Regions:
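Charged alpha-helical initiation segments
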Residues: 1-27, 155, 174-178
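Charged/polar positions within long, soluble alpha-helices
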Residues: 42-46, 96-107, 152-159
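Histidine-centered, metal-coordinating catalytic motifs and their short helical/loop contexts
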Residues: 83-111
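Helix-adjacent hinge/juxtasegments
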Residues: 52-84
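An amphipathic alpha-helical core segment
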Residues: 104, 108-131
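Short, hydrophobic, well-ordered secondary-structure elements
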Residues: 24-47
Length: 178
């Protein structure tokens, strides 16, 4: 199952970012893999729950449309006003900002004192894009924890058991470097 591999890498990257000094690259990787894992899991559930050819639906539908279709057919509710499903949109907005990144001109008014600016070791903070401001330890934790909760909820609501991370086929782990 692709989602198992993606989730394993997501968990690895999140752990590395949480424990390491150089958090940024690991958080970026884990936050992107939250989106990839969630969408792969939605595709997995659609194929298991609804036999037939769903490839057109998978390719043409957004992750939110896939989630809505699953909830409609299986009869469960995802409250997008509360966590964890409140985070769903943020995960995919972040993913889209990166996947569809464009060069932009950023301008910002700075209140950085001129005397500090003139010191060689002091520079004003650079303006950041939306995705760069989202790339924080707090958001990496929220994306990871809420994605894990969403996967567990969807797994249970699909009638497969209580914990997709404890099932035999989901115990796959990967060691070493990417």
């Amino acid at each position: 199952n692709p989602w198992v591999l993606l989730w394993s890498r997501c968990a690895w990257a999140y752990k590395q970012g949480s424990e390491g000094i150089e958090q940024g690259p690991y958080h970026l990787f884990s936050m992107l893999l939250c989106a990839f894992s969630l969408e792969a899991f939605l595709n997995h559930l659609i194929r298991i729950n609804f036999p037939g050819n769903w490839e057109d639906f998978e390719r043409k539908s957004s992750p939110e449309e896939k989630l809505d279709k699953l909830s409609e057919i299986l009869g469960f509710n995802t409250d997008k006003g509360k966590r964890p499903f409140q985070t769903f949109k943020h995960v995919f907005d972040f993913r889209n900002d990166i996947v569809h990144a464009k060069t932009v001109k950023l301008e910002e008014t700075s209140t950085f004192p001129i005397d500090k600016f003139l010191q060689a070791d002091e520079l004003p903070p650079l303006p950041l894009t939306k995705w760069e401001t989202t790339l924080t330890t707090k958001n990496a934790t929220r994306f990871f924890e809420d994605s894990q909760k969403m996967i567990a909820f969807l797994y249970k609501e699909s009638g497969f058991g209580d914990d997709p991370f404890e099932e035999v086929y989901s115990r796959t782990t990967f060691e070493g470097n990417l």
